[in-house]
């Protein structure tokens, strides 16, 4: 029986790029893998075919030979070199290092393994969070704060090596300096080579037998440090300031982490903030509401005078432009919204009561509002 065309097996054109071949292989390998198709002989055979096809087409030299001579280029000696064995005794021997990241990705999905190699290069230090509480005014206008942060710093005796001065780290006897442990696992479908970080040296390849006495071999010591922080005007609840390089020290020469300062703002007794605007409710007297006039209004900058019109009602709002929160970056300020409510006096002198009775007598039902209200009452209850 003639053998199938390798390009057809992977479902790609003969002019397909290496990246297209790789994508097609990964898709088919996951689809027909025996673990996802237990007992399916057809899927098992298909899996073998796509592996054989990919081994040849992923190698530029083998691909060129196949394009020129077809399957005959690999039939000398009875079998192709370096290919995959049949399912059966011994089965497949998958070494993730030999097939690049293809099987590393596939088998990390199927077996929970991966080809995560030990990190040996520089690594950034851990970040630190600090919660800072400000008063309403401090958040509005900005301020300077000194905070105290506890963090790890590079040991000043061993300079971060963790080794006692005059000593040197030794090669790890478990991984022999590679930082990795390779384990072979036999499965019903072959042998899986699992690569993991060495538990003895944690991927470093070296161990410390004579540690620094000050840091105990960690290379860092815990210290409390005071840091001055500039709080910009206009900052709000939940916003965050970032101080680069003020976090934990990096590993293997890596940069320090960052310090994140999370802002909290205490509630104000009378002011309420919404965005860059400030809201305040103030009482006015019955006389001021009726006659209008000048009243005093508290603002973030102090008391200011404001003239309200006669007949001002409870719930009326006025806007004081530019009296709100400064915009971050100095681009102007928000506004202050003033809502007034009429405060009814609880205690009146006899003179005040007399004047109000006279006012009530004179007022009668002459206002349009009252006429409208009493007319609606008469209509509702059938009055004449």
UniProtKB/Swiss-Prot annotation:
Main function: Participates actively in the response to hyperosmotic and heat shock by preventing the aggregation of stress-denatured proteins and by disaggregating proteins, also in an autonomous, DnaK-independent fashion. Unfolded proteins bind initially to DnaJ; upon interaction with the DnaJ-bound protein, DnaK hydrolyzes its bound ATP, resulting in the formation of a stable complex. GrpE releases ADP from DnaK; ATP binding to DnaK triggers the release of the substrate protein, thus completing the reaction cycle.
Subcellular localization, as worded in the UniProt entry: Cytoplasm
HAMAP family xrefs: DnaJ
Keyword Amino-acid biosynthesis recorded: no
Repeat region (CXXCXGXG motif), residues: 155-162, 172-179, 198-205, 212-219
Cofactor note as given: Binds 2 Zn(2+) ions per monomer.
Zinc finger boundaries on the chain: CR-type: 142-224
Subunit annotation: Homodimer.
GO CC entries: cytoplasm
An MF annotation (GO) of this entry: heat shock protein binding
Cofactor(s) listed: Zn(2+)
GO biological process, one term: DNA replication
InterPro entries in UniProt: DnaJ, DnaJ_C, DnaJ_domain, DnaJ_domain_CS, HSP40/DnaJ_pept-bd, HSP_DnaJ_Cys-rich_dom, HSP_DnaJ_Cys-rich_dom_sf, J_dom_sf
Gene3D superfamilies: DnaJ domain, Heat shock protein DnaJ, cysteine-rich domain, Urease metallochaperone UreE, N-terminal domain
Residues the entry annotates as binding Zn(2+) 2: 172, 175, 198, 201
Entry's free-text remark on domains: The J domain is necessary and sufficient to stimulate DnaK ATPase activity. Zinc center 1 plays an important role in the autonomous, DnaK-independent chaperone activity of DnaJ. Zinc center 2 is essential for interaction with DnaK and for DnaJ activity.
Residues of the J domain: 5-70
Protein known as: Chaperone protein DnaJ
Sequence similarity: Belongs to the DnaJ family.
Amino-acid positions noted as binding Zn(2+) 1 in the UniProt annotation, renumbered to this chain: 155, 158, 212, 215
Keyword Ribosomal protein in record: no
Keywords, ordered alphabetically: Chaperone, Cytoplasm, DNA replication, Metal-binding, Repeat, Stress response, Zinc, Zinc-finger
């Amino acid at each position: 029986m003639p053998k199938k065309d390798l390009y057809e097996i992977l479902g790609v054109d003969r002019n397909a790029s290496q990246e297209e071949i790789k994508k097609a292989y990964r898709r088919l390998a996951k689809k027909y893998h025996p673990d996802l198709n237990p007992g399916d002989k057809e899927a098992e055979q298909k899996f073998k075919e796509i592996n054989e096809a990919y081994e040849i087409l992923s190698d530029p030299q083998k691909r060129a030979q196949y394009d020129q001579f077809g399957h005959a280029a690999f039939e000398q000696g009875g079998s192709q070199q370096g290919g995959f064995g049949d399912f059966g005794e011994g089965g497949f021997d998958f070494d993730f290092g030999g097939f690049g990241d293809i099987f590393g990705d596939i088998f990390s999905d199927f077996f929970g393994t991966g080809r995560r190699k030990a990190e040996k290069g520089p690594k950034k230090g851990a970040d630190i969070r600090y919660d800072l509480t400000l008063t309403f005014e401090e958040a509005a206008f900005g301020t300077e704060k000194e905070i105290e942060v506890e963090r790890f710093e590079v040991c000043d005796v061993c300079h971060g090596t963790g080794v006692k001065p005059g000593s040197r780290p030794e090669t790890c006897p478990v991984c022999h300096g590679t930082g990795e442990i390779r384990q072979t696992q036999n499965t019903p479908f072959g042998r899986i080579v699992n690569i993991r970080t060495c538990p003895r040296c944690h991927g470093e390849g070296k161990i410390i037998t004579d540690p620094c006495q000050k840091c105990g071999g960690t290379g860092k010591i815990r210290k409390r440090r005071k840091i001055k922080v500039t709080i910009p005007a206009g900052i709000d609840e939940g916003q965050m300031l970032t101080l680069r390089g003020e976090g934990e020290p990096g590993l293997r020469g890596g940069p320090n982490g960052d310090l994140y300062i999370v802002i909290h703002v205490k509630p104000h007794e009378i002011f309420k903030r919404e965005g860059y605007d400030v809201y305040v409710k103030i009482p006015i007297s019955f006389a001021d509401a009726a006659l209008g006039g000048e009243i005093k209004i508290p603002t973030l900058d102090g008391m200011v005078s404001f003239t309200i019109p006669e007949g001002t009602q409870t719930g009326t709002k006025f806007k004081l432009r530019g009296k709100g929160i400064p915009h971050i970056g100095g681009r102007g300020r928000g506004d202050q919204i003033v809502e007034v409510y009429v405060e009814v006096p609880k205690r009146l002198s006899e003179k005040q009561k007399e004047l109000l009775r006279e006012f009530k007598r004179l007022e009668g039902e002459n206002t349009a509002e009252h006429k409208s209200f009493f007319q609606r009452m008469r209509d509702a209850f059938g009055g004449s």
